């Protein structure tokens, strides 16, 4: 009996997180089908899990970045520049794919009058201005509001200043960073329960019947995201590491993408991505900066959403689009996507900005945004899964390109699963 109990407890504490998440996923679906009321009640588990991740993520980013820069040794190599290039290349490539697929399989929308009091950004300059304003935010305000651009700016500044501090001070900062990491690991162990609650409550609240009317649009959107995740990203990774990219890609989708799909928050998934980078033995000086930065500017999924929904509105209204305009839309969508994390409503609220390129009135553009919110159950989940998993994929690719010793047929084989 004791052996049975210890075996069960061992599975809970040290077992594969992915397998446990799968159990939670199936249990959530079953509960939603059996009892709507019970499914809505367990939604609290999902709310608590996402809340815990969002609470710990800003502190984790601040401490990790500050500790890694403060303890950085002169001449030690990092891969931030190549990763930034991969982020921008991936986002622009995603926008191009979305344009191509939207022309091959044009979508149309049934636009109904929809009043909305949400203010969309007025232009690209406004989006970029908001991004720059995030850099100079008050540090306490940045932590409280999960402003990762501001947190990164302060962490880098304090880290550089602390490089001249006493060794005991650096050791204290490092110990604090390790302590926060332990808290993060504990929170992540509750992922199966959190996802059980999220799946059960989401299915009970919305079901999937409401999505059937937008089946074609969803197929185009999710098809683009799958194409980027399974074809474009592997091609970029292969170009970078010159090896079979799929073991790395599938490992990242499995470990990072699955969790991000259900939490629907790149910020909440930062601790998961950090832990995965640690399991792959990547350079902490690199991933402690690139992962939170990726959660802010690496937005391939957002670029796809902006492009597909904008072109759906264009096709619905019968507006002709030539090739140069389509290419310009790709650039605009990529730039907008990089600022999506700083806009309330994310990628959907940047659609009116892209629609403005084609002279579409704001009233109609906001109706397109309303359609986006209707399909958000799947659209936002798939978008976040692509965005967040790509952060780890490109970080790992850049690190492996710089250090061939990190290459492994199974990227996570060197250590046990979380």
From Swiss-Prot:
InterPro entries membership: Na-dicarboxylate_symporter (IPR001991), Na:dicarbo_symporter_sf (IPR036458), Ser_Thr_transp_SstT (IPR023025)
Pfam families: SDF
Record's keyword annotation contains Chloroplast: no
Highest rank taxon of the organism: Bacteria
Annotated GO biological process: serine transport; threonine transport
GO molecular function terms attached to this record: neutral L-amino acid:sodium symporter activity
Membrane topology recorded in Swiss-Prot or TrEMBL: Multi-pass membrane protein
Cell compartments where the protein resides: Cell inner membrane
Catalyzed reactions: L-serine(in) + Na(+)(in) = L-serine(out) + Na(+)(out); L-threonine(in) + Na(+)(in) = L-threonine(out) + Na(+)(out)
GO cellular component: plasma membrane
Ranges annotated as spanning the membrane: 21-41, 45-65, 83-103, 142-162, 193-213, 217-237, 301-321, 331-351
Keyword Transmembrane helix: yes
SUPFAM superfamilies linked: Proton glutamate symport protein
Keywords, alphabetical: Amino-acid transport, Cell inner membrane, Cell membrane, Membrane, Symport, Transmembrane, Transmembrane helix, Transport
Family: Belongs to the dicarboxylate/amino acid:cation symporter (DAACS) (TC 2.A.23) family.
Role of this protein: Involved in the import of serine and threonine into the cell, with the concomitant import of sodium (symport system).
Protein name: Serine/threonine transporter SstT
Species per Swiss-Prot/TrEMBL record: Yersinia enterocolitica serotype O:8 / biotype 1B (strain NCTC 13174 / 8081)
């Amino acid at each position: 009996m004791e052996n049975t109990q210890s075996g069960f407890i061992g599975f809970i504490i040290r077992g594969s997180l992915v397998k446990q998440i799968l159990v939670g996923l199936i249990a959530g679906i079953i509960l939603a089908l059996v009892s709507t009321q019970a499914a809505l009640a367990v939604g609290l588990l999902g709310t608590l899990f996402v809340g815990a991740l969002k609470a710990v993520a800003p502190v984790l980013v601040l401490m990790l970045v500050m500790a890694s820069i403060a303890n950085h040794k002169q001449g030690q190599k990092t891969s931030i520049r190549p990763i930034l290039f991969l982020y921008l290349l991936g986002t622009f490539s995603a926008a191009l794919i979305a344009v191509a697929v939207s022309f091959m399989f044009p979508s149309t929308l049934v636009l109904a009058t929809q009043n909305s009091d949400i203010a969309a950004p007025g232009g690209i300059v406004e989006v970029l201005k908001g991004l720059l304003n995030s850099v100079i935010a008050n540090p306490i305000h940045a932590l409280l509001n999960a402003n990762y651009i501001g947190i990164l700016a302060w962490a880098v500044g304090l880290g550089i200043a602390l490089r001249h501090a006493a060794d005991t001070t650096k050791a204290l900062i490092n110990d604090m960073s390790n302590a926060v990491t332990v808290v993060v690991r504990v929170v992540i162990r509750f992922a199966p329960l959190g996802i059980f609650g999220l799946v059960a409550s989401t299915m009970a609240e919305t079901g999937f019947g409401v999505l059937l009317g937008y089946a074609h649009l969803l197929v185009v959107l999710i098809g683009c995201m799958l194409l980027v995740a399974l074809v474009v990203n592997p091609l970029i990774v292969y170009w970078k590491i010159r090896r079979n990219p799929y073991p790395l890609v599938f490992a990242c989708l499995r470990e990072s993408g699955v969790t991000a799909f259900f939490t629907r928050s790149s910020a909440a998934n930062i601790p998961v991505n950090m832990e995965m980078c640690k399991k792959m033995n990547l350079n902490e000086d690199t991933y402690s900066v690139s992962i939170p930065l990726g959660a802010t500017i690496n937005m391939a999924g957002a670029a796809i959403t902006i492009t597909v929904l904008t072109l759906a509105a264009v096709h619905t209204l019968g507006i002709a689009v030539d090739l140069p305009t389509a290419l310009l839309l790709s650039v605009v969508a990529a730039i907008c996507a990089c600022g999506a994390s700083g806009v309330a409503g994310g990628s959907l609220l940047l659609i009116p900005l892209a629609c403005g390129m084609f002279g579409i009135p704001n009233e109609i553009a906001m109706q397109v945004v309303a359609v986006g919110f209707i399909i958000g159950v799947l659209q936002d989940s798939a978008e976040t899964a692509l965005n967040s998993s790509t952060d780890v994929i490109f970080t790992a690719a850049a690190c492996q390109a710089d250090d061939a010793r990190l290459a492994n047929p199974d990227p996570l084989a060197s250590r046990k699963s979380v």
